[in-house]
Regions:
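Conserved N-terminal alpha-helix of the aminotransferase class I/II PLP-enzyme fold
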Residues: 35-84, 109-116
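Short loop segments at secondary-structure junctions
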Residues: 30, 219-224, 314-318
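Short, solvent-exposed beta-strand edge segments and adjacent coil->beta transition regions
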Residues: 47, 245, 305-309, 366-370
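Conserved PLP-enzyme active-site core in the AAT-like
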Residues: 7-14, 75-280, 285
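N-terminal "arm"/small-domain region of PLP-dependent enzymes with the aminotransferase-like
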Residues: 1-57, 369
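Conserved small-domain helix->loop->beta segment predominantly found in fold-type I
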Residues: 269-328, 332-340, 353-360
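Short, well-ordered beta-strand elements within core beta-sheets of diverse protein domains
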Residues: 249-259, 307-315, 370-374
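PLP-dependent enzyme catalytic core of the Aspartate aminotransferase-like
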Residues: 115, 124, 260, 318, ...
């Protein structure tokens, strides 16, 4: 059965007693039991059934089950945001005195989590150029607990060799954890490239309409202790499980993800090619362009599509602000992969609290605009960009 059919097929998915064709929304907090013995068996894990909505809910379980079928993951856990998913997977693999090997080019909040929050608890980090395998090998040692990366960085659109990184990780007996938000898991097979755990913000492509927060951890089962810690410890003690309304919306979003993503990716490629011909745009960064330095590696790892994020560089920060202010169709908003096209100036928004020196180290330029391409007609998007450039 093809992935698009699996995403929509409800006959093979856990359903409710009334045979609801669409996923039912369960908003209850607790569940009633027939007797005390059954209640004890459920709460101690001898019988599998929901006991409390902070750790299990049928609507959320439905989403987890569908994602598991689509991805081939051994275990899927849904969290209430992308950052909650990232935090919990890192909580599961690290401890005081351990070291996370990661990129200098991380999403701002992820970088702050690793170098700030976790550092306060005694967790170290090595910020590397993950495209430089020798540098990563030199950073890996007995204290390392994982290699963590984004499969395509935001907004730099840098791509690292996942197989090479997985070999370094597995030589040390540690997992390779990949944030796959930029390319949907339905389009890739990261497990075949040596990725042990995928983490993603389901707020983005799965939500689509920008109406629900969520995050997913897709665990491929190569390190059994990870799922044991997430399901047996962190869900209970951290309390970051996805809320049922988000799961309901994102399950419906999953059913149309294939159609929406392919349109967005096609729009992005068409627009990226045309942007190179617009006077005033000094650089266009998109891995689907044949002259992009990561073009071949991206196609090898992620297939024929390159996602819906484009970075453009203008002459100055002032030119970027003027461009954003002039937009009429494209929205000034910070989400990614919404149905609508969005634009931000990353250096002053999602990286706005970082000092200039650190922005330079992260290759976040004051001249960069990030575009998240939506479902509008691509020529209408281009017309708006042209008039905004002036």
């Amino acid at each position: 059965m093809k992935k698009q059919t699996i995403a929509i097929d409800t006959k093979s998915v856990r359903s409710d007693v009334y045979g609801s064709l669409s996923v039912p929304l369960y908003t209850n907090v607790s569940f009633e039991f027939d007797d005390a013995s059954l209640m004890a068996d459920v709460f101690t894990g001898r019988v599998k059934a929901p006991d409390y909505a902070r750790v299990e809910n049928p609507t959320v379980t439905n989403l987890e089950y569908r994602v598991q079928k689509l991805s081939g993951a051994a275990h899927v856990t849904a969290f209430n945001s992308g950052m909650a998913a990232i935090s919990n997977i890192l909580f599961a693999v690290t401890a005081q005195g351990r070291k996370i090997i990661t990129s200098r080019h991380l999403f701002g909040n992820t970088l702050s989590l690793i170098t700030g929050t976790l550092k306060r608890f005694g967790v170290e980090s090595a910020l590397c150029d993950l495209t430089n395998i020798e540098e990563v090998e030199a950073a890996a040692d007995d204290d390392s607990c994982c290699i963590y990366l984004e499969i395509m960085t935001n907004p730099q659109l840098e791509v690292a060799d996942l197989k090479a990184l997985s070999q370094i990780a597995h030589k040390r007996g540690i997992p390779l954890i990949a944030d796959s938000t930029v390319i949907p898991f339905t389009e890739t097979s990261l497990k075949d490239l040596g990725v042990d755990v995928e983490v993603l913000s389901s707020t983005k492509y799965l939500s689509g309409g920008g109406t629900s927060l969520g995050g997913l951890v897709l665990d491929y089962g190569t390190f059994p202790q990870i799922n044991e810690r997430i399901k047996g410890d962190l869900l209970f003690n951290v309390g970051a499980y996805m809320n049922p309304y988000s799961a309901y919306q994102q399950t419906l979003g999953l059913e149309t993800l294939d159609v929406r993503y392919k349109r967005q990716a096609a729009n992005a490629l068409y627009i990226a090619r045309e942007l190179r011909n617009i006077k005033g745009i000094e650089r266009v960064t998109y891995t689907g362009l044949e002259d992009n330095p990561f073009y071949e590696l991206a196609r090898k790892q992620f297939g024929p599509t390159s996602g819906a994020m484009i970075a453009i560089d203008l002459a100055s920060k002032e030119a970027c602000f003027k461009f954003i202010n002039n937009l009429k169709l494209v929205h000034r908003a910070t989400n990614l992969f919404d149905n609508r096209t969005l634009a931000i100036h990353p250096a002053s928004t999602i990286f706005g609290l970082f000092p200039e020196r650190q922005l330079e180290q992260m290759d976040v330029r004051q001249t960069t605009i990030r575009l998240s391409i939506g479902l509008e007609d691509p020529d209408d998007i281009l017309d708006d960009i042209r008039q905004a450039i002036g």
